[in-house]
């Protein structure tokens, strides 16, 4: 007991010293306004009991669109207006181009050797360029069209028997399986044998990567990092994921060794390309197994979670708004009335469906706080100082619901985009579902392709209804916690095959 008391006393003195240092620093710099703080934990108590993007939106209404928030020992700034977002993502983009350390990404992505969470620099540029060239470019995305077609056929075939048996369709589960299979075949060249386990592990990691864990708000207090159990869960998930991906890499190395040299580049998937580049002596940063694993996990997490989240939200919002659902389905069936099958080129003509997806991503940005940035150099914005190492969060969920920029902001109205030039590429700072600037998501084309085609096919081939006894007003649109804001709870529906 005496040893415990001594330990607690020493810890208290250490924390007190840190707190005094923070107070001295904050008094010498004009930080943005923010909510009141408590010793040691700062403003963490303001986030208790709510989803961070919602709580931070409410706080910003009181303290302003550039708000300071002390998260334990981490100084953070929250951006909640298009004007301030432009300052961070465009005007001072280079100053805010790096990423803060997050425990989940350090563990699961091999000390941030991925792309999304890698610090800004030459390594990030090299790996981003490789991934864009090999799998994320428009040309590469088009080359995967036959894979998407195959997976959509499998998706439709898996739903058909539910009508005969009277079983509800777990729409969420089917869409996650489609997007994960699509991503697997693009990255690995095949569906994983352990795909179900792999999906579960990646989703678990995503749920733990919110950035508000004890280790993320007290990074220098290593003795606290085990509290709450998140670190152990991440380590367990990492071991299992590492084993699965290691087997994939070994298989690709074996196949590459037996493949004819003149056929080495034709028909490559991402792992093939990365394995081949392991022997490229011209690379500034040589590629090893851990680099490949980190990039694979990155692509899989982003490619699966964001696309599936958007597709599920789109269906939920359409069923919540029956007139939108009826119009979207009618447009699809009218466009393909005389066709036995249709492909991605045909889907490009479905203008109303594109409006539905745009509106879905306005209300339900896949990553509501974007992936946080870190200030690389002291910067002044709107008369306030943003110190080096400040964590910067852009609340794109709040931007998409700001009544100053969106008429009837909380309502689902795809038609609002009809006479509007707003797009996904980060030039409109009131609408940033994929972020903006140097760290904009490089997989926009890949992600959207995995939403448009399956949603169009599902609207064409099935009549969708809520479970018996449930009205549109009863449909729950609550979000789950995590770095992504997926719908809380799986979406169960009745699917009746359509006979043209």
Swiss-Prot record:
InterPro entries: CYP450_71D, Cyt_P450, Cyt_P450_CS, Cyt_P450_E_grp-I, Cyt_P450_sf. Heme binds at residue 441. PROSITE patterns: CYTOCHROME_P450 (PS00086). Keywords: Heme, Iron, Metal-binding, Monooxygenase, Oxidoreductase. Its cofactor is heme. Its EC number is 1.14.-.-. Gene3D superfamilies: Cytochrome P450. GO terms for molecular function: heme binding; iron ion binding; monooxygenase activity; oxidoreductase activity, acting on paired donors, with incorporation or reduction of molecular oxygen. Belongs to the cytochrome P450 family. This is Cytochrome P450 71D7. It comes from Solanum chacoense. The lineage of its organism: Eukaryota, Viridiplantae, Streptophyta, Embryophyta, Tracheophyta. The gene is CYP71D7.
